[in-house]
Curated annotation (Swiss-Prot):
GO molecular function annotations of the record: ATP binding; poly(A) binding; protein kinase activity; zinc ion binding
Entry binding sites for ATP: 325, 375-382, 428-429
Subcellular location field: Cytoplasm
Descriptive protein name: PAN2-PAN3 deadenylation complex subunit PAN3
Amino acid sequence: MISSASGTNWNRPDSFKGTQCRNIIIHGYCKFENEGCQFNHGNSKETEGQTTDEVPTQRSMTPLNVKFNAKTSSSFTPGKSPAVRSPDFSSLPAFQPGAPVNDQPMLADGPQISGTMSPSLMNSNATAFAPSFNPYASESFTPSVSAGGIPSSQELAGTLHGSNPSIPSPVPSNPYVNSAGLPSGGMLGVGHPMQGLPPPPPPGALPVNPITQFPTVYPPTHSVLQYHLYAPDPPPHLKIPLKPNERTPETLFINNHLRDRLVKNNQTALQVFPRGSLPDIVGDYFGLVPMDFHNRTSDKKRYNGHKNSLYKVFSNLDGKIYFMRRIHDVKITDSAQVSKPFQTWSHLRSANITVLKDSFVTSAFNDSSLCMVFDYYPQSQSLYETYGLANSVNELNQEYLWAFLVQLTIALQEVHSNGLALNDLDWKKVIVTGEPGRIKVTDIGVYDTLNYHQEGRMLHTEQQQNYLSLAELLLNLVQRLCGASGPLDDVKSYHIDPLFKKCIQYLQDTSNNNKNIEDFTKLFSHKVLSVVNSLQYNSEYLEQQLSRELENARLFRLMCKLNAIYGRLESRIDINWAESGEKFPIILFFDYVFHQKDDTGKNVMDLTHVLRCLNKLDAGVSERLMLVTPDEMNCIIISYKELKDLIDSTFRALTQ
């Protein structure tokens, strides 16, 4: 320790009190501080007063309510010499680029920054010790309205609580355009509101929008990369021909397009939203999710002037997902009006008709609503939504028209053969459920329920009207295919297959009141063969993809069984799991499969080895393998069949 008093007189004048003690600079402290050392040790209030008095004062403003504490601030960044006490700059406002120095607000009884800074401030490390306000880390940051369009604290609070959702929150690209003051009621507690944007975040930090810090009512979007980390196949013109023994990652897994479609179907089926004013339970169903967002008033004609709503619901009976059509404010006094049409339509089974699962009247919506429940198909859209909207990008060609015609004819044949009629046949009531162009007629039985007591209904007349409705549906699709907007009944003006025109003309013929499915299908019987061939090819493709996943499901069950019995707490004190126990081979086999190491002790990640061992274990082959302990002092020779029996018996004992 260097004594500051060596070679000096302890009774010297106080002229050395402004000189920094060398012990503080070298060692960080001075043991003679309380024994008469006359030099400055950084804790003298007089020194602080002298430091701040070096800056002349010219004007003042309202003093701060709360002083900045650099020790408790998350934005405090100490310099290289933490022992050296720096001047207190906590009372100074944050410097804003682009603003004149003379226009910076001054503090009462404090320093004022003039056009020329004092040498003492220029020489001190102000950058390392000057505190900076970080609005992104402060929970009390409340911006007010400025010229840049930033909402005030009251408006922002109203937006976050849903009271004023119409207030936008734009963020200017240049945060230095507006002059910034001090935040209102924030960390520094200044009485006047902020007149601009806060300082930018530190380099490397991502700016955070205050609104995004609060949870939203809608679930987050999902990325496909969460489910498959392999790169997609290149375009067909960039593919390199492979040898018979070569494989690509896609050949080891399910097709990317099919996997993506199935994953999105699962996401759509399990997606829920806040129920809002909807009831918790309606009949035997819960978790109502609105599905129809189009709000078309023209649909009232289809339901005898009643409004309708569409919901996705979860069944309390079997746990499956269905969709429910609600007809608002239906006055039904006769129970047969609901039960009879349901019994008639619920037994229909066709590949192109959605199954009617339930029909009931409920007052859960504070009115008398008719609810009809059907099978649910995720991501399905009507023909109108798929091809009829102006912004639709789905491809429509002549082959799709033939496929739609064949499938709708199958649906009509099933309905007419059961003595019924599709009175609601429209392209808004036909949904596309999958590829290639698979469709289903939905909302069956609704018309018969609403018009149960209508007199003068003739089944033959209604069935003949179905052919006219089918012609109108097909002409709507033809219009979208040809890009024309002419009258629907003028089929001759469209450039399509002449045979397809002939089919539509047969459906539109009002002079023929005895149209039937048998005569109609004779017009395009050879087209039915091509549609059947396409659907059969698609079914074989799906079966091939499913056969690949069969192995994954089998091995997944086996891995679940292994992990259920391996590494349990009770096995640590059970003698059967010791090296001399009968279950010790399970531990060695688990390490042999998943914890492989090479000769140098490096971990080996060999998926082929894992699949080979698990396949042999699942099959229970008689092949023997040698399992060695980690210390290589003991080994066990055992067959896969014996291992399988041992694992099965252990798992059964665990589940009993």
